[in-house]
Amino acid sequence: PSKHTEIQEAALRAYEDEENHRIAYNSACTEAHGYGTDTRLIEIMKFMHSCGYKRIGFAFCNGLKNEALEVTKILEYNGFEVVSVVCKNGATPKTWLGIEDKDTVRGHADREVMCNPVGQALALNASHTDFNIMMGLCVGHDTLFLKYLEGPVTVLAVKDRVTGHAPLAPIY
């Protein structure tokens, strides 16, 4: 399907939109000027600066709260205003989803709080962020977050507890 002329023409027309053009242009420049030398976090910050983004939404997993705190400090030090929302926002017990004890991490559905990626997205939408960063949301939770988030977003890191958050490691 990537060779269909109609699809490629529609794709190029999409870049005529001011926001799409700015994102594509600054992404290409960020890639060119940091290729192989800048970390993902540095690339994200350079990209956000070049796009003029200031108010940054940050959706993260509670399991990476220490890392999220460090990332927040770095972003703020570099001039960004950070609005963060943890996955456990709302503090709703997993029983609300119909989850039973046998299907929980610790065996107590009534005391285990569900992740709320829809809540993360809606909170960031309501905060009118310029740009958003997602870090470490569970598989499926990331899907719901992306489905409900209205603004542009990038992924800083995905969670993989087995590989130290490097999910491609097993294929090398």
Regions found by a protein language model. Give the residues of each.
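Long, charge-dense
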Residues: 66-117
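Short, flexible loop segments at the rims of nucleotide/cofactor-binding pockets, characterized by
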Residues: 32-36, 107-113, 131-132
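Electropositive, gly/pro-rich neighborhoods at or near active sites that engage anionic ligands
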Residues: 1-55, 62-66
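Gly/Ser/Thr-rich loops at beta-strand to alpha-helix junctions
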Residues: 34-38, 60-68, 90, 132-143
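Short, flexible loop segments at boundaries between secondary-structure elements
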Residues: 150-172
